Amino acid sequence: MTNVVVSGEQLQEAFREVAAIVDSTVAITAGPRGKTVGINKPYGAPEITKDGYKVMKGIKPEKPLNAAIASIFAQSCSQCNDKVGDGTTTCSILTSNMIMEASKSIAAGNDRVGIKNGIQKAKDVILKEIASMSRTISLEKIDEVAQVAIISANGDKDIGNSIADSVKKVGKEGVITVEESKGSKELEVELTTGMQFDRGYLSPYFITNNEKMIVELDNPYLLITEKKLNIIQPLLPVLEAIVKSGKPLVIIAEDIEGEALSTLVINKLRGGLKVAAVKAPGFGDRRKEMLEDIATLTGAKYVIKDELGIKMEDLTLDDLGTAKNVKITKDNTTVVSENSDSDSVKARIEQIKSQIETSTSDYDKEKLRERLAKLSGGVAVLKVGGATEVEVKERRDRVEDALHATRAAIEEGIVPGGGVALLYASSVLDKLKGASDEEQIGINIIKKVLSAPIRRLVKNAGLESAVIIDYLIKQNDKELIYNVEAMNYANAFTAGVIDPAKVVRIAFETAVSVASVLITTESMIVDVPSKENASSPMGAGEMSGMGGF
């Protein structure tokens, strides 16, 4: 491989090409009347999806320069997906339109730094306006919760109602997970007991699902300790017993490092041991209490610590905890238990309640209530089924999107949906003036781009957007939307066409961040096949003039 430097108008043209591909491929999935996209796989049948994030990841242009730019777009979707798990299609629409508009201005000779400064200035004003438009959502208003989920699930009422019902059952601190069902029933909810804490896997090598970048272990044993583990020798007897049992192992410890961590990773990669390790949640005395909670929930005999005088070498499988399944992301661990009705769990709950009553510290009471909610709130498992694997995967994508959107709505409230929140927010830019002509161009770009999501939603429904947008603006009612599913104008909250404010905010913030980076990029260094590689689709003649880009 060799590389070349691409800059100037050739780079700007590549930016516009990729932005146009994204706008025409990812954007067609937007809204209830959006279309599905087929993504070819190296093996098996193509995946049919309406998930904008998956479509964006599937775009791999043949030209090396375009492929590099597409990967940056995909990274923006990934950031949005990681933060809220939804809004990736909106983020793609905003990013691609910002790039196309800014690239035209740069090609006309305008200063790119000034344009970026104007975009950043407009961003700050728009974020404040989105926050002011937000309306708090209550768990008691189950219809509002359901509507958020229904919209994110592309109008599927069964998904929306199931998620709303799950939220109501487990509460704000409860956990909701999604898994594929072996049956043909489209969607069912199973309520069980478990908890989630904010610690992720200690090494990405523990990952079992590379597509979602998570660890999923069924029926694992749990070894819970307050100790730091840095040598493997004391663990060998229990690890050998685990291997013989054929079950996975999850280790929760103060820390795992050095030889202990590397040995676990090597054995996992070789297939000899299904294992994952996470750090214990919390700090100090609170960490000790949370480990005791986990031990009680999983039926472990004890948390292994120096005070007990128990040696690691003497552990047996009977001393360990068990769970129905454990899911670990880079940030969180979810334990679904089969030990929920045990006397020890009930006694632990009563003990925490008693501590809440006797505590004189508001801070301590708050933390105790969090522990109580985690221990007693439960876990709702949404089981997704279908007639074929393709159907199951497509439905699971929509369920997960809807679940993420619902969580975001509970956190930061809701705003009118259907793309109007950004459209109406753009009106505050009328009074914003840039310090230079280029800054004003940047502000004007944001003002124009903020109408892109609603334009795309209406276009996907086969309608003319200009007439609808003009009518909405003239009515001067920030709760008025155009419902592309019912094909009529309506109040957003009455019609249930609403979006989580957090999803709208993150999608816009991320789009501005990525667009700002690309706008100020003057050159890109791109790897291309060497001239000697005759089999390359890009011959030597193309390389010398860089026509293969």
Swiss-Prot record:
It is an enzyme of class 5 (isomerase). It catalyses: ATP + H2O + a folded polypeptide = ADP + phosphate + an unfolded polypeptide. It is found in: Cytoplasm. Keywords: ATP-binding, Chaperone, Cytoplasm, Isomerase, Nucleotide-binding. PROSITE patterns: CHAPERONINS_CPN60 (PS00296). GO terms for biological process: protein refolding. GO terms for cellular component: cytoplasm. ATP binds at residues 29-32, 50, 86-90, 418, 499. InterPro entries: Chaperonin_Cpn60_CS, Cpn60/GroEL, Cpn60/GroEL/TCP-1, GroEL-like_apical_dom_sf, GROEL-like_equatorial_sf, TCP-1-like_intermed_sf. SUPFAM superfamilies: GroEL apical domain-like (SSF52029), GroEL equatorial domain-like (SSF48592), GroEL-intermediate domain like (SSF54849). One of its GO terms (molecular function) is ATP binding. Its EC number is 5.6.1.7. It comes from the Bacteria. It holds the Pfam family Cpn60_TCP1. Forms a cylinder of 14 subunits composed of two heptameric rings stacked back-to-back. Interacts with the co-chaperonin GroES. Together with its co-chaperonin GroES, plays an essential role in assisting protein folding. The GroEL-GroES system forms a nano-cage that allows encapsulation of the non-native substrate proteins and provides a physical environment optimized to promote and accelerate protein folding. PANTHER family: 60 KDA HEAT SHOCK PROTEIN, MITOCHONDRIAL. Belongs to the chaperonin (HSP60) family. This is Chaperonin GroEL. The lineage of its organism: Bacteria, Pseudomonadati, Pseudomonadota, Alphaproteobacteria, Rickettsiales. The gene is groEL.
